[in-house]
């Protein structure tokens, strides 16, 4: 919390469940209370509630259920600007990676964005299979 007060452009949380569990255990809170506290903290910093008055963007890594559903409360879904899923076309070493948005308030939904991490230091991407 004090670290965030400095002000950042972007913060990566890996993973939402892990951080939520840590907050819950450290404070002796219920899961719901810890989640509300985290969401309120993110909302505060998204609205520039920090020393540098930066509108902080948060990237939260969140697991999916075995059925492929979002694991978390509806409040997380509601406060999220965009939800992207990293997936594979095919199986094995040659399966192509892609990103697909299931929710995106500022762009398209449902388009597969293929990407490659094979060239060190570069991320290549395309809307068509490479």
What are these regions (language model features)?
Residues 88-130:
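Conserved P-loop NTPase
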